[in-house]
Swiss-Prot record, chain C:
Residues 1-24 form the signal peptide. One of its GO terms (cellular component) is GPI-anchor transamidase complex. It comes from Drosophila melanogaster (Fruit fly). GO terms for biological process: attachment of GPI anchor to protein; GPI anchor biosynthetic process; proteolysis. Its EC number is 3.-.-.-. GO terms for molecular function: GPI-anchor transamidase activity. Keywords: GPI-anchor biosynthesis, Hydrolase, Protease, Signal, Thiol protease. Mediates GPI anchoring in the endoplasmic reticulum, by replacing a protein's C-terminal GPI attachment signal peptide with a pre-assembled GPI. During this transamidation reaction, the GPI transamidase forms a carbonyl intermediate with the substrate protein. Disulfide bonds: none annotated. Belongs to the peptidase C13 family. It is an enzyme of class 3 (hydrolase). This is Putative GPI-anchor transamidase.
Length: 426, 674, 355
């Protein structure tokens, strides 16, 4: 099995390497679906150049990458620019490997848990339980879904910094499953200071590590705040100024760049009257962060990893500058819930949605920007449909999980008065 | 929320099962509905009267000031030009045109370009355009309008349109005396039909950009002077100063149209000057009044969509559309021979000159690019149109068939081995008991995603090769014309596609999965093509959807005659065959007197030429038709062909395969392309 | 039951009738002198705010409109310092104008309304709803030039003229924003509360113009609009050599009327209100008089369009004495006298440090 794992990694790398050398790569690097103001490669280059020239990169309105990343990559960018694609490919492969290790561990944990609870399960629910083969299948599916998803491949060849975010997130998931508190906290703090939204992942982290003790929870939260501060201070020492806070977090929160992307922000904020801006800004940011956090955390307190998956997915839908690379990441996590798939009624519909909207996005973008015959509304329609598809997927996953839990203990065939029972959400 | 949180536990839905049983009927009903909707569009209730929505144009508010002396000048220039044409049989009298432009006080420049014709060893052609800029007298040169006239040498096979040059120059002379221009006017005279225009436009927009000259087939060079961003363009093709009617041509590259306001503007001003003008305007004598409104409208719609679907511009204006410049051609046709009306030759061109002046002044009033009115429309008659919102439902209904069928096929995909066997028709009587035993322990069946994906990739690769192979240096160096080369490459690759399903047999469940994938790709492709070029999308849909609906991979419920019919239909639907049939029909229409064999032969050469032109158009002008046919339709056809053959692995083989320990979806097929 | 209802109605009806009679009686009882006094002009100075809210070449007519009124008020004596002219676009110098530097109200080029000296106070993108409301209410930003302020007081008669593209309840400013009738009414109410006008003549030439004055509640406002709600205001004619509509009908006839008015003419606002009958205007001119206490037919037109103040020539000797401090301080005992305090000079440079 191990040899297969390496083969897949190699193949994934080869695919990326091939596309890097086609004219597709620079094209993807300029597509708004993949490269947003936050993660675009060009802006990273600009930031590193400014940093090297001793100019504060955040004084302008172009660079929104965190200073630590800029200074860490500046050597590579300046001296070996020809190896950059390979660097990104390696990062992406690391992400895949981390996801693989994480899912191996996860399935094992699930199986252990199952062994303990097996007596309580209803009969005829074998197909809902993690089977012996899942230990091989699920990690493999995860890694295939990450390595060969066109979304992540394109994101990688476009050299967007989403590749770096995905690596950190994968590391976070890995530590979460492995139960390594300190690295988990640190990487989360780093991502939070870098791109703000991952702050919601503190919820699954607390659920995993606090072990139902409030004191531990408070201590971990305090530790998280301290590590955020440490990361911020570390960033501060790169430039000796706090400008980066406004350039990264402020830029995300205030949504200063209205460039179109696949998200929901840009259209509303271009169309809206200026004096409502503050209100909608807060509404949209609340929607992207805390709105779903509390109910989901209560509902999924026993499944912190599912909670993390759903939060990452919601983040990819509702964040200010989403890119398709984010979508690719959470799609790769879906195979972890393979045993819920039976109940996912909309899988095919969502897939069709994705296919149609993504292909239409290209056409409508062309008509809007190049041909000048369509307009922003057409494009926004496509992105809105895409987001709707994603929301379908997320709710479907959640509901499938609820159904699976129910059926696992109560059996799959429940008849009430001769009719098939229906589950009602209350 | 009901949609999001389906409360039933079981995943089977009665509605889906019911629909799945009648999938063909439902789809055919949708198809008929879509086509019927399309027919209805020709009814006056379904289309709207045109109107001008851009206030700034204010057409027809000015009295034309151009007078008879401009007409006299045009006549004089035409006589001079006729003399020049005797000396320049196959070239353009550049010196004369430049001298005239200089004389009228225009800022005159020439533009040289080179075409590197890649086929048959490679040749180089040189061309030269002349343009004069009239700077806006009281404003910075930030915007411009182009007035273009193609020049055809005396030896050209096309209709003589040399009167356009004198007309353009006469108007330039008039325009220079006016002080109210708010945009620079560019008077452009191109040669070699669309090539010159394409080169000029490329030079205007990208001339100062460093291009990789080794790859470029058209080297546009650079321009010595520009006039800001171009807002609109008017292309003039005048056969003679005495005109019968004006044909307004609008179809541009890849079926793009100028803003409806521009067409309306021209129509309104032509009407004011009393010129018979319109879209596909017929000569006075031939105009049919016997037809009903519906028939006329429908004919108009069809001709417009037909000329749009090829993506080839109907005039030089079409190339402007690529640069987001609204443009159209006014093609003035010569008056038929008659002596009675020739009373006043001295003022024959005045109405046309006045119309050009009116259009120019309206365009001069523009404050931003055309954006108010429609870009997606179909003209049913000169003053009626169908907007995108009205015609799109026809296409959507057709495409919906594909998605509906895909969904239903997916939801009835075999989930267990037993179902699979049933589907494949392999269930034999003596195996029923064994099957029953199996049923107690339904082993879940994994669909062969991997192999299907690889099969899809292989077909797409064939399509990709169609684009790339004919342009490989190795092939280009063969001393062979473009047409035979392209055709042989295409036929070779089609042949591979034809053979592919015989060589590669998909594992069980693969065909069904391939069917779903095919329907999804097909639907997406039609939607995208329909968005970019509605006419092409619609025709492709109308042509292929019935076949796609009929196509079925299950053997149980289809008779062998039906299967064979479908196979035959699929064969005919091969893109190359379709091109041939279309060309054949056109040849038959044009030369009905020839014997059948000769027609077929002639059509064959014409089809070969057509494919070569398609390739050249895609390389030089950026026409998508060749790309679409090769990269989308050919792979889809190969899949379609595979599905219609429905080659299945022998059941015994399948059992052997199933006993092997590997359960993961490993690619089983070895694709042998090239 | 029904009968009782009927009786009630009849009683109520009778009461209403009776009360009306009483009111009618009351009005007739007003002393003659009071009525006359109310009709007398009471202002001390004149201001005009003239606004063209639309830009673009094809809106030439709106600029011609506003310049026509500008020309008239200036000719009738309001100085440029008391005219606030807001014009959103420069038609005279537009590159499309075949007659540079000139704007005409008529295709025959009778009157060049652009004239020799036009002082535009707000131009181009300065013509915004915000600036207009700030101007009316006097809440201009710090540093605003004196020429951009409406420095009117309780004795000012103010003429407000608006033109542009309007709809039911709004007037569009430059295709990007609009002022609503409510905002306008609020602005004028604020002017009244801040004693920024004595009487106000509100004149508007746009489609559905009457909707703009519907929400007014402030006293002493007379309003006239070129069209009623639901009607379009139409342009007068096209100059075929320029290719634009020259001027709007209402303003065209208003200008025709004003051209005949001389500074001491006896023409009244009442005549001016009838300047454009439906026959020539096509739209119905709307007038709102209920807020205006005087009879328009007794108000000279120069009360708003000129700067003629009621002056009385007196041959009597008048004692003019300059005011003393005593005139203002009435209660000398209560005045707090400041305690004397010692003034110490601080040295500018701490030279003692260096000693």
């Amino acid at each position: 099995m191990d040899s297969k794992f390496f083969k897949l990694l190699l193949l994934g790398g080869a695919v990326r390497f091939y596309f890097c050398r086609t004219p597709l790569a620079p094209m993807i690097g300029n597509r708004v679906e993949f490269a947003t103001p936050l993660n675009s490669h060009k802006r990273m280059q600009e930031g590193i150049f400014l940093l090297q020239s001793g100019i504060d990169p955040y004084l302008g309105d172009l660079v929104h990458e965190s200073p630590l990343i800029l200074s860490a990559l500046s050597g590579l960018f300046q001296k070996y620019p020809q190896f950059l694609p390979i660097f990104y490919i390696i990062l992406d492969i690391c992400t895949a490997a981390l996801l693989y290790a994480m899912s191996l561990r996860f399935v094992k944990q699930k199986q252990d848990q199952q062994d303990k609870e097996r007596k309580e399960y209803a009969k005829d629910t074998e197909e809902l339980q993690f089977g012996p083969l899942d230990k091989l299948d699920i990690p493999e599916l995860v890694i295939v879904a990450y390595l060969f998803s066109p979304l992540t491949v394109m994101s990688c060849i476009g050299m967007t910094s989403t590749v770096i975010s995905n690596l950190f997130l994968a590391f976070f998931f890995y530590c979460l499953v492995k139960g390594m508190l300190i690295p988990c906290l640190l990487v989360l703090a780093f991502e939070t200071v870098r791109s703000f939204y991952p702050i919601v992942l503190i919820a699954p982290l607390l659920l995993v590590f606090s072990r139902n003790s409030v004191r531990r929870g408070v201590a971990i939260a305090a530790l998280f705040i301290v590590s955020c501060l440490i990361v911020a201070v570390a960033n501060y020492f790169v430039l000796n100024s706090w400008n980066f806070l406004d350039g990264t977090l402020g830029f995300i929160f205030y949504f200063r760049d209205l460039q179109p992307n696949i998200g929901l922000f840009w259209y509303f904020f271009t169309e809206m009257f200026e004096h409502f801006r503050t209100m909608f800004l807060i509404t949209f940011q609340l929607n992207a962060t805390v709105l779903y956090l509390v109910p989901l955390s209560i509902k999924l307190r026993k499944e912190p990893l599912l909670l993390a998956t759903v939060l990452v997915a919601l983040m990819a839908v509702f964040r200010a500058y989403p890119s398709l690379g984010d979508v690719g990441f959470y799609l790769a996590l879906l195979p972890l819930w393979k045993r819920c798939w039976k109940f996912m009624a909309h899988g095919f519909v969502v897939f069709t949605f994705f296919l149609v909207t993504l292909s239409m996005m290209g056409a409508l973008w062309h008509l809007w920007i190049y041909a000048g015959s369509a307009n922003a509304n057409f494009y926004f329609g496509a992105t809105l449909a895409f987001s709707t598809g994603q929301i379908f997927l997320i709710t479907d996953l959640l509901f499938a999980h609820v159904k699976r839990e129910f059926c696992l203990f109560n059996g799959q065939k429940i008849l009430i008065d001769g009719e098939e029972a229906r589950i009602v959400l209350k | 929320m009901g949609l999001l949180s389906d409360p039933s536990i079981s995943t089977q839905s009665k509605l889906v099962d019911g629909l799945a049983r009648h999938v063909r009927k439902v789809c055919y009903a949708l198809y008929v509905a879509g086509v019927a909707w399309f027919f209805c569009l020709a009814l006056p209730e379904f289309n709207h009267g045109t109107y001008l929505s851009e206030n700034a144009l204010s057409p027809g508010l000015v009295y034309p000031e151009i007078r008879i002396d401009a007409n006299r000048l045009a006549i004089q220039l035409l006589e001079e030009l006729q003399r020049e044409r005797k000396d320049h049989l196959s070239t353009t009298p550049h010196a004369w045109i430049a001298a005239k432009m200089n004389e009228f006080g225009l800022e005159t420049h020439t533009h040289n370009y080179t075409l590197r014709y890649p086929f048959g060893g490679g040749k180089e052609y040189h061309g030269k355009n002349i343009y004069g800029i009239l700077r806006a007298p009281r404003i910075a040169s930030t915007e411009g309008i182009v007035f273009a006239a193609p020049y055809r040498a005396a030896s050209s096979v096309h209709t003589d349109i040399s009167a356009s040059v004198p007309l353009l120059l006469a108007f330039a002379d008039f325009a220079r005396r006016k002080n109210y221009w708010a945009k620079d006017l560019i008077f452009l005279i191109t040669e070699q039909e669309q090539l010159g225009m394409q080169a000029w436009l490329e030079a205007y927009h990208d001339g100062d950009r460093e291009l990789d000259l080794s790859k470029a087939y058209l080297r546009p060079g650079n321009l010595p002077a520009r006039a800001g961003s171009l807002q609109a363009a008017l292309n003039i093709e005048v056969q003679d100063l005495e005109i019968d009617h004006v044909d307004v041509r609008i179809e541009g590259l890849n079926g793009k149209l100028p803003n409806l306001d521009m067409f309306n503007l021209v129509q309104r001003i032509m009407a004011r000057e009393g010129i018979a003008s319109g879209y596909k305007q017929a000569p006075r004598k031939k105009r049919r009044h016997s037809q009903s409104h519906f028939e006329q409208n429908f004919r108009q719609m069809l001709t417009m969509l037909a000329s749009q679907s090829s993506g080839v511009p109907t005039g030089n204006h079409g190339l402007f559309h690529r640069y987001r410049i609204d443009a159209l051609t006014i093609a003035a046709n010569r008056r038929a021979t008659h002596a009675t009306l020739k009373g006043s030759p001295g003022s024959a061109a005045v109405p046309l000159l006045k119309a050009i002046e009116g259009i120019a002044r309206s365009l001069n009033n523009l404050l931003e690019r055309f954006h108010q009115s429609f870009f997606f429309y179909v003209i049913v008659s000169n003053d009626r149109y169908i907007s995108i919102g009205d015609y799109m439902p026809a296409l959507v209904a057709l495409v919906a068939c594909a998605f509906l069928k895909a969904y239903l096929t997916w939801s009835t995909l075999p989930a267990t081995n037993a179902e699979l066997e049933k589907a494949a028709g392999w269930l034999r009587e003596h195996e029923q008991e064994a099957e029953l035993e199996e049923n107690l322990e339904p082993d879940k069946f994994e669909l062969p995603y991997g192999s299907v994906l690889i099969y899809l990739t292989a077909t797409l690769l064939i399509g990709f090769l169609c684009n790339v192979l004919p342009l490989q240096q190795y092939f280009l160096e063969i001393p062979m014309g473009a047409a035979p080369l392209t055709t042989s490459v295409l036929s070779f690759l089609s042949l591979i596609g034809f053979v592919l399903p015989f060589v590669v047999v998909l594992p069980p469940g693969g065909l069904e999965l391939l069917h779903v994938a095919f329907l999804l790709i097909y639907g997406c492709a039609l939607i995208v093509i329909g968005l970019l070029n509605f006419a092409l999308g619609l025709f492709a849909a109308v042509l292929t959807v019935p076949l796609v609906i009929a196509l079925e991979t299950k053997e149980e419920n289809s008779r062998s005659t039906l299967r064979n019919t479908i196979r035959l239909a699929t064969l005919v639907m091969n893109p190359m065959m379709v091109v041939y049939v279309i060309v054949l029909a056109m040849t038959f229409y044009q030369f009905p007197e020839l014997p059948v064999q000769k027609i077929m032969l002639r059509a064959a050469t014409a089809a070969m030429d057509a494919s070569a032109y398609g390739l050249i158009d895609s390389v030089i002008y950026g026409n998508w038709l060749y790309f679409v046919i090769c990269t989308i339709f050919l792979p889809l056809w190969i899949i379609c062909w595979t599905l219609s053959l429905s080659k299945r692995r022998d059941y015994a083989d399948y059992l052997d395969f199933d006993e092997s320990p590997s359960t993961s979806p490993q690619p089983q097929s070895k694709v042998k392309t090239n | 039951m029904f009968n009782i209802m009927l009786v009630k109605f009849v009683v109520i009806f009778a009461l209403i009738l009776a009360s009306c009679r009483v009111e009618a009686d009351n009005t007739s009882v007003l002393p003659e002198g009071f009525v006359d006094a109310a009709q007398r002009s009471t202002h001390t100075n004149n201001w005009a705010v003239l606004v063209d809210a639309s830009r673009f070449w094809f809106n030439y007519r709106h600029v011609a409109n506003v310049l026509s009124i500008y020309r008239s008020v200036k000719r009738l004596g309001i100085p440029d310092s008391q005219i606030i002219l807001m014009i959103a676009d420069d038609m005279a110098c537009n590159a499309r104008n075949p007659r540079p530097g000139q704007v005409y109200n008529n295709a025959n080029q009778h009157i060049n309304v652009y004239g020799d000296d036009v002082e535009v106070d707000y131009r181009g993108y300065e013509v915004t709803v915000e600036n207009f409301v700030r101007l009316l209410t006097g809440r201009t930003q710090n540093g605003t030039a004196r020429s951009k302020k409406l420095l009117s007081d309780a004795g000012s008669n103010v003429l407000i003229y608006l033109t542009g593209h309007g709809g039911d309840g709004f007037l569009k400013f430059q295709d990007s924003e609009e002022i609503t009738s409510q905002e306008l009414a609020d602005g004028i109410q604020q002017m009244w509360e801040k004693k920024r006008y004595n009487e106000l003549f509100f004149m508007v030439d746009t489609c559905q113009a009457a909707s703009l004055y519907e929400k007014f509640t402030s006293p002493n406002v007379l309003a006239v609009a070129s069209s009623l709600v639901g009607e379009d205001s139409l342009s007068h004619h096209v100059d075929p050599s320029i290719g634009v509509y020259m001027i709007d009908r209402y303003t065209y006839y208003a200008l025709e009327f004003l051209e005949k008015v001389q500074p001491f003419s006896k023409r009244t606002i009442g005549e001016f209100l009838q300047v454009c009958p439906k026959r020539v205007c096509i739209s119905t001119v709307g007038v709102r008089k209920d807020l205006y206490p005087r009879d328009p037919h007794k108000v000279p037109i120069t009360d708003f369009f000129g700067a003629i103040r009621p002056t009385r020539v007196s041959t009597d000797r008048i004692n003019v004495t300059l005011a003393n401090e005593d005139d203002f301080i009435f209660d000398k005992d209560k005045m707090v006298t400041k305690k004397p305090f010692k003034i110490v000079m601080e040295s500018q440079f701490p030279s003692e440090l260096f000693k």
